[in-house]
Amino acid sequence: KNCKIKKMIYLSSSTIYQKNHFIGINKLKAEKHLIKNKLKFKYLQIWRPFNLIGSNQTQLTDHFHNYLFKVIFLEKRKFVLFNGNESDKRGYSSIDEFVKILQKYSSKNKSFINNFGNPNLISVKDIISIYNRVSNKKLGFELNHKFKSKKFNINSVKNLNKRKNIYSKTKSEHVIEHF
């Protein structure tokens, strides 16, 4: 209760910008609690990363690239009906790149809220093409697919003007190819 912390670094999530997203709602509550109690810290640093991918990932999340990987390479399914639209776009960043930037900025003695993401977007259709090239080579088949939605969604750090944005310098396509 009476503990004085010099620097609090909180890893939040870009899901705080989405309506009714379970993780986003809880991450935002945590952010608000930290901000309300910021006098307990000399410096408060909040990070909101977008679509991070690690090459040594052992757990698959519910993100599209992970779901697609699971469907093609683990389940070896030949057809999938997706909820979204093939024109949906995302900006992917490497966890390794994010960690380097996090270390650099976190060493500064100042408070901030930063978004981290990749303004270089890749479409869901292009992600499927990349995975299909690999599956064709390694498994001898490509995934056939359809999408339910006519409306497309663009999830980009570039759409945010509210806070400081720090951008990945790597193309999303390159990040996906090295997943």
Predicted regions mapped to residue ranges:
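Short catalytic/ligand-binding loop motif for oxyanion handling, primarily in non-cytosolic enzymes
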Residues: Y17-K19, S55, S123
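Short beta-strand/turn micro-motifs composed of small residues
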Residues: S12, R48, G117
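C-terminal substrate-binding subdomain of Rossmann-fold SDR/epimerase-dehydratase oxidoreductases
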Residues: K76-F179
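NAD(P)-dependent short-chain dehydrogenase/reductase
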Residues: L28, K32-G91, I95-Q103
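PG/GG-rich flexible active-site loop of Rossmann-like NAD(P)H-dependent oxidoreductases
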Residues: T15, N51, L121
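Conserved Rossmann-fold NAD(P)-dependent oxidoreductase catalytic core, especially the SDR/UDP-sugar
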Residues: K1-I25, K40, L44-Q45
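Short aromatic-enriched loop/helix-cap "lid" or pocket-rim segments at secondary-structure transitions
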Residues: F22-I23, Q57-D62, D126-S129, N153-N155
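Short, electropositive alpha-helical surface patch
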Residues: F22-A30, R133
